[in-house]
Amino acid sequence: MSLNSRFVDLALCACLAVCFPRTFCACDASDDTDFPKSVALAKKTNRPLLLAFLGTDWSISSLKLDREVFDQAAFADDSKYNYLLCKLHFYQTQERSPEIVRQNEDLAERYHIEQFPTVVVLSPDGGELGRLGYIPGGVDKFAAAVNTLLAKSRSSSP
């Protein structure tokens, strides 16, 4: 294989990794959809949990939130220390296991989800602290909104 073709292969891989970061993520992408595991980890690590109710294959705002915020390395770095993310997908065109579909529908009913996307912010013990939707401006704006919500909940708790 020539040096030129190796360079082309490397450049193609780099482009794919940038365009589709979850595909090239070293972590198991399915982990962030496991609600019981996410709740247990939030308690264990004493971090808030973001429950993201998403319809990424039919809701433009859900798709934007997922691509502009959740799929960005900067969000992963911030959330690694400050909070956890659990994505709950409501696909219309993709198949999901019946267990995941049931879990997500039950959670949408429990939290009275009426629009997508909705991000329910939970305390480490499971209490609801607030809600967010899509916020234009990428990771910085979204993380600032989450941090503001968390600061308000801390200042109002006894």
Regions found by a protein language model. Give the residues of each.
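Non-catalytic, surface beta->alpha helical segment in thiol-disulfide oxidoreductase systems
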Residues: E68-V69, D106, R110, E114-S155
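Thiol-based oxidoreductase modules, predominantly thioredoxin-like and allied folds used
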Residues: D31-D32, Q72-R102
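Bacterial N-terminal signal peptides that target proteins for export
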Residues: S2-L12
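N-terminal "domain-start" segment that seeds a small globular fold
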Residues: F24-A40
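Active-site-proximal beta-strand/loop segments in catalytic clefts of secreted hydrolases
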Residues: F53-T56, L88-Y91, L122-P124, Y134-I135
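Local sequence-structure signature of Cys/Sec-based thiol-disulfide redox active-site neighborhoods
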Residues: K37-D71, F75
